[in-house]
Swiss-Prot record:
Domain of life according to the entry: Eukaryota
GO cellular component: membrane
Alphabetical list of Pfam families matching this protein: PUNUT (PF16913)
Transmembrane segments: 39-59, 71-91, 107-127, 128-148, 166-186, 202-222, 238-258, 283-303, 309-329, 338-358
Name by which UniProt lists this protein: Probable purine permease 22
Membrane topology: Multi-pass membrane protein
Family: Belongs to the purine permeases (TC 2.A.7.14) family.
Keyword match Transmembrane helix: yes
Gene that this polypeptide is encoded by: PUP22
Length: 377
């Protein structure tokens, strides 16, 4: 009787062990599947960002090269396609399962949300306009390389707003990106700027630096807002912020377009466009579409990872622009510009590697309590 009981108990234990192994295998395969889907989404968003921003930038320069003169139009191209994000929000809402979390966190008040959307929208309109002025006066290759300094500004503002630590890798990135931009401003004589005076070149440089600073400030603010204001990190919160700030920025730029009187010159500008009326419309429409696909990619990366990661992926596409500029616009590619590209890529890699180390450290801290809990059980 005792032996049969032992066999019965052993059988129960084996059955329980098999069931536990089966449950562990199923629970392990589900996160793996989710992780693969997440990285597939991240890859798609990254492709949107890497390729669409350079294409939109080149099309903006093509508009200027062939008779376009309105900086407000180029600014508007970066913003006016925001209704695409409304569709993106609609589909993400369908896909997102209903939350069963009983811990309800209070949503921000209407006044708080309105203030956030208004302030970020004004900042977005400001840096979009500054980048349009910079693109007008600078060769597109120089413009894109200076714009890479947005990584340095993101780290700088995150130090004050988000307690970002200045590790040796971050300091190295800041130094390299600063030197990369400085090389371009001291080497104006070698640039192909026959239609631009030295004063206009300096104005373009200052405006592009200002645009980079604005991008860094907005991304750091977004990170701060999702820590202090939008405590529930949902796709709806990310997309609402992107939609409403774009709406505010678009309204501000439209007011500027009509107040400046530039809208009166648009019909004659289209008639006198060197590539023809159809090309004029296609250039502007394509640029607006590429900018919005780029925005969808940025918003997706912010939601899937972080604003810092989104900004890092943005910087990957910037070295593509100088290569395209040499082919399309015959920009000069001298030794100083090549060295500037190398420094910018080096600074970017340093920044991304630090982000990788931070993510790895965060995952280790999150998994350690779980491992300790399983060991105690």
């Amino acid at each position: 009787m005792g032996i049969s009981q032992v066999h019965y108990c052993n059988g129960d234990q084996n059955l329980e062990a098999n069931l536990l192994d089966h449950e562990e295998t199923e629970s392990f395969s589900v996160p793996q599947t989710k992780n693969c889907k997440r990285w597939l989404r991240v890859s798609i968003y990254a492709i949107f960002v890497i390729f669409c921003q350079p294409l939109a930038t080149v099309l903006g320069r093509l508009y200027y090269e062939n008779g376009g003169k309105s900086t407000y139009v180029v600014t508007l191209l970066q913003l006016i396609g925001f209704p695409v994000l409304i569709l993106f929000r609609f589909f993400s809402r369908i896909r997102q399962p209903k939350s069963t979390d009983t811990n309800f966190s209070q949503s921000p008040s209407f006044t708080t949300l309105a203030s956030v959307y208004l302030c970020t929208g004004l900042l977005v309109s400001a840096y979009a306009y500054l980048s349009a002025v910079g693109l007008l006066y600078l060769p597109v290759s120089t413009f894109s390389l200076i714009l890479a300094s947005q990584l340095a500004f993101t780290a700088f503002f995150s130090y004050f707003l988000n307690s970002q630590k200045f590790t040796p890798l971050i300091v190295n990135s800041l130094f390299l990106l600063t030197v990369s931009s400085a090389l371009l401003v001291v080497n104006t004589d070698s640039e192909n700027t026959t239609n631009v005076s030295r004063v206009q070149y300096v104005i373009g440089f200052i405006c592009t630096i200002g645009a980079s600073a604005g991008i860094g400030l907005v991304l750091s603010l977004i990170q701060l807002l999702f820590r202090k204001v939008f405590t529930k990190h949902t796709s709806s919160a990310v997309l609402d912020l992107a939609n409403y700030q774009s709406l505010v920025a678009t309204c501000v730029v439209l007011i500027g377009l009509f107040a400046s009187g530039e809208w009166r010159t648009l019909p004659s500008e289209m008639r006198n466009y060197k590539l023809g009326k159809v090309s004029y419309i296609l250039t502007l429409a394509s640029a607006a579409i590429f900018w919005q696909v780029y925005t969808v990619g940025c918003v997706g990366l912010i939601f899937e990872s972080s604003s810092v990661f989104s900004n890092s992926i943005t910087a990957v596409g910037l070295p593509i622009v100088p290569v395209v500029a040499v082919i399309v616009f015959h920009d000069k590619m001298d030794a100083s510009k090549i060295f500037s590209i190398i420094l910018a890529i080096w600074g970017f890699l340093s920044f991304v590697y630090q982000h990788y180390l931070d993510e790895k450290k965060l995952k280790t801290c999150q998994t350690k309590p779980v491992e300790e809990e399983t060991q105690t059980l």
